[in-house]
Amino acid sequence: LWAMCASYGLDPRSSDPDALFEDDAELLDELRGWAARNAGETLLPTGKNLRNLNPIVRESGGERQLDLGWWGYLVDGAPSRFPSINTRSERLAERRGALPSTAVVPATSWFEMQKPSRQWFSFGAGDTEPQLFALAAVTQPGRTADGDAFTCYSVIMRPAPERLAHVHDRTPLLIPAAFMGDWLAGEAPPSELIAAAIAES
């Protein structure tokens, strides 16, 4: 499961042609500022000691906000022993009750390993320049053994469409601008919200 999506990129030179964050210039500036300060870095699951945190966008009080999240879940003060950087869309769709809090993860590329060749492939939205897109995620609060509190997140993986299935059988669930509000509000039943997100992706 860890190989499903264990790294992605966020290029500070990215454009936002789909207007994912067009209505919030301050958020977009914060995001690009973070990307510039971390230019050239591959975004990886958060390490227990390094504590690398990555940008996520959530909704609070009807407004979108940029937070730094811990990629993977914290359980009993430590990174979970079960794989938690990714969550299968089917698992969420079958969930009883409401979804965990929803978020999106800004990115300009993601990386998948093709098996058995162990060859890495990079996927992105722009042909000539990096373009922003949004990975669907769910979040939950977490706390380390020393008492520090974090927002933890898990990237949602869906069955890969046919055009990508030759590389990997799973792919991140992408949230387009037109569906961003519905996704971040997270009000629909899980099965409906996940089905709609996949249809819009």
Whereabouts are the PLM-identified features?
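Short linear sequence motif anchored by a di-proline
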Residues: 1-201
